[in-house]
């Protein structure tokens, strides 16, 4: 795992055990779930224990608990940056604990761990594979319209109007429907929806987003096998000098073909803690970020410069919502207004629990932003809930 254990002292191990106990205690006080809104109370929203955690930063909570070990804090800060795009000084204590308590908890070295805890199933395309599978039946039925940018969404007395620019034809098209699922990031939805509802405008002002730089490096042959940790799917560089550096993923690590060959390394930088990061992304070209990624990888892999044949950088100005203090409490109240109208939510003919979907009379909003942080499970479940509401 990523938790530093080699050469650490007993004081560090003791803090690992104390943090493990604290995560377990937090889970007993109020359950953590993924998707997170499965744990919301239908009438009051976020549990009082979670509201208290949501009111402070994770760093402040750790200080409160007397957890100040440098190795533990490095690991926890990495986990926050990896999932939330910003470190423990910026995300809430709720978010820091949710990372562990909603999954398998935190296990200190020597503690019993379930056999399946470390099992990881991935695809070379990452979440791209999941989106391709979700899109395939829509494409087969002619229901997927790509190469189109939505310019305006407006509720009318009879339904919903959507104005969209077709990049293939160069024309603006108007689509009409009885209802619409708006699966856009909140900051985009607030600009696209005409006369946005108050909760959407408030969320756009309240939420904060982390910029990311993602660098894909094509290698014509495997990197040299060097002493140290064995190659893995997710590889973290301890002491990465790049701001926000998270290490890299090897796209071919879980290929069934055991023969070594060309591969792609994806290096990530989460820039939520970097001042003016969005401006830096906009003004510094792709070459700057590509060179930074190669320099970081050249430390553990000196032969990367000889193996690299192509470098592609993608800059995300608003990659994901950061769960800063107060966000969970705020978002938990939005879905409590209930489903507009009197329609029942049905799935396969069975009535479903009404999930807290932000909605107006004709628009249902579905995006991981409404959960305050970005993972596939949140996005998928919110889309599913919005689809049931619209159904």
Task: Please describe what each predicted stretch is.
Residues 55, 59-61, 65-67, 72, ...:
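Conserved beta-strand->loop/alpha-helix structural units within folded catalytic cores of enzymes
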């Amino acid at each position: 795992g990523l938790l530093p254990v080699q050469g650490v002292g007993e004081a560090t191990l003791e803090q690992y055990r104390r943090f493990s106990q604290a995560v377990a205690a937090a889970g007993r006080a109020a359950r953590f779930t993924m998707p997170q809104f499965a744990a919301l109370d239908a009438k009051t929203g976020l549990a009082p224990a979670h509201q208290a955690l949501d009111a402070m930063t994770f760093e402040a909570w750790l200080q409160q608990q007397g957890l100040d070990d440098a190795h533990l804090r490095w690991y926890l800060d990495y986990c926050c940056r990896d999932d939330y795009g910003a470190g423990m000084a910026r995300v809430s204590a709720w978010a820091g604990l949710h990372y562990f308590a909603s999954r398998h908890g935190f296990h200190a070295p020597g503690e019993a761990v379930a056999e399946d805890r470390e099992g990881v199933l991935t695809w070379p395309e990452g979440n791209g594979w999941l989106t391709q599978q979700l899109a395939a039946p829509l494409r087969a039925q002619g229901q997927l319209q790509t190469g189109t940018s939505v310019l305006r969404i407006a509720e009318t007395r009879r339904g919903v109007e959507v104005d969209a620019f077709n990049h293939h034809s160069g024309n603006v098209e108007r689509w009409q429907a009885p209802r619409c699922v708006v699966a856009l990031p909140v900051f985009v939805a607030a600009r696209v929806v005409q006369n946005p509802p108050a909760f959407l405008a408030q969320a756009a002002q309240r939420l904060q987003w982390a910029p990311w730089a993602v660098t894909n490096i094509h290698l014509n042959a495997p990197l040299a096998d060097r002493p140290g940790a064995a190659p893995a799917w997710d590889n973290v560089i301890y002491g990465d000098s790049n701001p926000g550096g998270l290490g890299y993923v090897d796209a071919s690590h879980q290929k069934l073909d055991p023969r070594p060959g060309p591969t792609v390394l994806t290096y990530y930088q989460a820039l939520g803690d970097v001042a003016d990061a969005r401006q830096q992304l906009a003004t510094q070209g792709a070459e700057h970020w590509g060179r930074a990624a190669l320099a970081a990888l050249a430390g553990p892999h000196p032969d990367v410069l000889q193996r690299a044949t192509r470098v592609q950088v993608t800059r995300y100005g608003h990659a994901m919502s950061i769960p800063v203090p107060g966000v969970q409490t705020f978002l938990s109240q939005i879905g409590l207004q209930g489903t507009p109208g009197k329609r029942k939510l049905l799935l396969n003919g069975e009535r479903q629990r009404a999930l807290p979907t932000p909605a107006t009379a004709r628009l249902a909003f579905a995006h991981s932003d409404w959960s305050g942080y970005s993972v596939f499970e949140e996005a998928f479940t919110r889309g599913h809930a919005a689809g049931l509401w619209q159904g």
